Regions:
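Short coil-to-beta transition motif at edge beta-strands of beta-rich domains
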Residues: 2-22
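Exposed beta-strand and adjacent loop surfaces of beta-rich binding modules
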Residues: 8-10, 28, 38
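Residue-level signature for short turns and capping positions that connect secondary-structure elements
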Residues: 18, 46-47
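Residues that act as N-cap/strand-start positions at coil-to-secondary-structure junctions
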Residues: 23-26, 66
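Short beta-strand-centered aromatic/proline hotspots
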Residues: 25-34
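Generic beta-strand structural signal
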Residues: 33-36, 74
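Short, solvent-exposed secondary-structure boundary/capping segments
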Residues: 37-44
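Intrinsically disordered, low-complexity, charged/polar segments
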Residues: 47-105
Length: 105
């Protein structure tokens, strides 16, 4: 079921790795803009986005002095918000679970 986020709403990002989910943020992102089936999210500071255990190199995003900004698009096929453009293991936006941070303290 599609979650229709609102500007200002918080979320976590997860990276599906084979059969496990790896948390790759230590605090929530915030929805900055909503445009149909695309959302733009922002972190308040430049961040390192986690890496699947099976990847060889970590996946960094640009060091934006205004904070990290990422775009996510709704996937009808997978019924989830995922990073756009998608990578091999596209990051997934998870709403309503801000206090759950598996593998990271």
């Amino acid at each position: 079921m599609k979650h229709n986020p609102m500007v200002g709403e918080k979320l976590y990002i997860y990276t599906p790795c084979y059969d496990m989910w790896v948390s790759d943020v230590r605090r929530p992102y915030t929805v900055e803009a909503v445009n149909g089936n695309t959302i733009t999210i922002r972190e308040a500071r430049p961040v390192f986005l986690g890496v699947c255990y099976y990847d060889t190199l970590p996946d960094y995003i640009e060091d934006d002095p205004n904070g990290a900004r990422l775009k996510f698009r709704w996937s009808e096929k997978k019924q989830r918000w995922q990073e756009s453009p998608a990578h091999s293991y596209p990051r997934v936006a998870v709403f309503g679970r801000w206090d759950w941070q598996p593998y990271l303290n």
